[in-house]
């Protein structure tokens, strides 16, 4: 099995694992959730820089292309954030009879926001695989996203069930999110492999998208419940974990 297939299937499996855990763990304490997300944010931060942006600069003398790609990746995620509130209507779920339709609408917005971010996250993993040369940083993007997938998938299960969505449909939603991320992996891999000119741009784009997710979503979330110190040290530990892995191999 090729590395890109391992990456794609691994990301999908971690979403399903998180969803299954969500059926048994109804509510993960904020302290643990913030600590885990902080650790993941540290890995994602290091992976964005070492696994995507630095290789992008090394791949071309046209540094401005990389800068443009980074800003475009962040802007793309920003646009997704702006349009997310309008996309839940396409699911049709809000038209059905549930225990609490008002609650369901808010839950669907949350689920849709997670789902939409899985496409560019998958693309980032795919682009990093297209530049793979055996270094731990080649896998760091996929590992960071995979670790993030588990708690994210866990937290969408309980709200969906409480809003009246059936268990079968909840599992189907989780599976669909996993397929969306797999699609992103292959899109990113294809674009990154298309040409030497496209590779640094796509690496920068993926790096910008991951930095946006880390700064705009993951870090603020870990600081929202009073456990910012634990989350900060967890972030530092995650960042250093990747640096140590890179140093140990190289």
Which residues fall in each region the model found?
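Intrinsically disordered, metal-sensing/regulatory segments
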Residues: 1-250
